[in-house]
Swiss-Prot record:
Heterodimer of LeuC and LeuD. The keyword Kinase does not apply. InterPro entries: 3-IsopropMal_deHydase_lsu, Acnase/IPM_dHydase_lsu_aba_1/3, Acoase/IPM_deHydtase_lsu_aba, Aconitase_4Fe-4S_BS, Aconitase_4Fe-4S_dom, IPM_dehydratase_rel_enz, IPMI_cat. It is an enzyme of class 4 (lyase). Transmembrane segments: none annotated. CDD domains: IPMI (cd01583). GO terms for molecular function: 3-isopropylmalate dehydratase activity; 4 iron, 4 sulfur cluster binding; metal ion binding. Its EC number is 4.2.1.33. Keywords: 4Fe-4S, Amino-acid biosynthesis, Branched-chain amino acid biosynthesis, Iron, Iron-sulfur, Leucine biosynthesis, Lyase, Metal-binding. This is 3-isopropylmalate dehydratase large subunit. NCBIfam families: leuC (TIGR00170), PRK05478.1 (NF004016), PRK12466.1 (NF009116).
């Protein structure tokens, strides 16, 4: 039998029918639903007189539009409130395996809530009307975002039409240095292969450095796969995966658990499996990362300097650097560790899990917010993350440092709720995109790890966390 990649195994086990032109009908195991991309899909079902094909495949929450402060005042923005209320109504009418509404203890960012509830399991196909659905590939699952029409298609048929991507292996060999996190690994890889480097590929992350990551770290890495242009990102199943899933609310139990684990252990690429493309990186080369421009690929080690467009020979790239520097208000040659910040945001589906908050708290402990830093928002990814952080006293560390301890939600990752940047405000952010206007009109975003964000909060500028030990 031909050796198969993990992607081959996941894909082949879910093909319902081949259409003959490379297109297949692909079965979907888990459908994650939030308030932004579902209203039109539910409306389409109503107009056609259809029901959900499999109610027990749907797990839903509100996240993009929900405020992370002043919950006693409810949702103030009328459009945001309409979307959240509409989700409430649709779930009541159509049903779901689980629904975590606004202000429910289980509510949170869909890509944090799903895994912590055990709604994401190894071997599954997982879709959501959200580009960062690739997060769930950390479990040895095939996960990717879909458009609103595909959301309706999945609701009505439990299938989507799709074409198989090419396969890519990105291996990081060796051990990561102290202070280097999964976020740094993700940004480093994107800096090396570019935001189009993974276009057309399903990426498997491997190597010693990847296997050493926790599930939280693997989720961060797979979350960022889309920023390298990939359709999906994934990590093979191992004991770390199985230990994380065990005991979760929607995980199998008893004999079903034993059978599931037996199957899950097969979800690795076979020895001798051939990938369409491979990259290998040395963990020793990876330092804490900071983006300087308006694309995740515009990234450097913390010891670097803002690039000089005059040194770029490619006219298209040179123009891109010039535009980015103008938007970001930066001068060529400026050391990254001399760039001051106005706002710090620690949260998002990339970095709002308990491990992320622990890393940030370890840096913040015993320090105060720098005088030039206007606000530091700490936004846990879910009500359960918030509860755990408070049990550990992390909230007190943040509050004593002068940070804001918020309620769960997508928050300042995107300008879709009350948390947003003002024009020209510079933000150290643990989110996943630094596009122009992503966090607010005219806002300037620098992507970093939670520890690096906390360091910027207490020093007032980007700082190598390894100097703070």
């Amino acid at each position: 039998m031909t050796a198969q990649t993990l992607y081959d195994k996941l894909w082949n086990s879910h093909v319902v029918r081949e259409e003959g032109d490379g297109t297949v009908l692909l079965y979907i195991d888990r459908h994650l639903v939030h308030e932004v991309t579902s209203p039109q899909a539910f409306e389409g079902l109503k107009m056609a007189g259809r029901k959900l094909w499999r109610i027990d495949s749907v797990v839903s929450t509100a996240d993009h539009n929900t405020p992370t402060g002043d919950w006693d005042k409810g949702i103030q923005d009328p459009i945001s409130k309409l979307q959240v209320d509409t989700l409430d109504q649709n779930i009541k009418e159509f049903g779901a395996l689980a629904y975590f509404p606004f202000m429910d203890k289980g509510q949170g960012i869909v890509h944090v809530m799903g895994p912590e509830q055990g709604a994401t399991l190894p071997g599954m196909t997982v879709v959501c009307g959200d580009s960062h659905t690739s997060t769930h590939g950390a479990f040895g699952a095939l996960a990717h975002g879909i458009g609103t029409s595909e959301v309706e298609h999945t609701m009505a048929t439990q299938c989507i039409t799709a074409k198989k991507s090419k396969s890519m292996l990105i291996a990081v060999d060796g051990k990561l240095k102290a202070g280097v996190t999964a976020k740094d690994v993700a940004l480093y890889i994107i800096g090396q292969i570019g935001t189009a480097g993974g276009t057309g590929y399903a990426v498997e992350f491997g190597g010693e450095a990847i296997r050493s990551l926790s599930m939280e770290g693997r989720m961060t890495l797979c979350n960022m796969a889309i920023e390298a242009g990939a359709r999906s990102g994934m990590v093979a199943v191992d004991q770390t995966t199985i230990d994380y899933v065990k005991g979760k609310p929607f995980a199998p139990e008893g004999e079903a658990w034993d059978k599931a684990v037996e199957y899950w252990r097969t979800l690795v690429s076979d020895e001798g499996a051939v990938f369409d493309k491979e990259y290998r990186f040395n963990a020793e080369d990876i330092e804490p990362q900071v983006t300087w421009g308006t694309s995740p690929e515009m990234v450097l080690n913390i010891g670097g300097k803002v690039p000089n467009p005059a040194e770029e020979t490619d006219p298209v790239k040179r123009s891109g650097i010039e535009r980015a520097l103008e938007y970001m208000g930066l001068k060529a040659g400026t050391p990254l560790n001399e760039i001051p910040v106005d706002i710090v945001f620690i949260g998002s589906c990339t970095n709002s899990r308990i491990e992320d908050l622990r890393e940030a708290a370890a840096i913040a402990k015993g320090h105060k917010k720098a005088g030039n830093v206007q606000r530091v928002l700490i936004v846990p990814g879910s009500g359960l993350v918030k509860e755990q952080a408070e049990k550990e006293g992390l909230d007190k560390i943040f509050i004593e440092a002068g940070f804001e301890w918020r309620e769960p939600g997508c928050s300042m990752c995107l300008a879709m709720n009350a948390d947003r940047l003002a024009p020209r405000q510079r933000c150290a952010s643990t989110s996943n995109r630094n596009f122009e206007g992503r966090q607010g009109n005219g806002g300037r975003t620098h992507l970093v790890s939670p520890a690096m964000a906390a360091a910027a909060a207490v020093t007032g500028h980007f700082t190598d966390i390894r100097t703070m030990a």
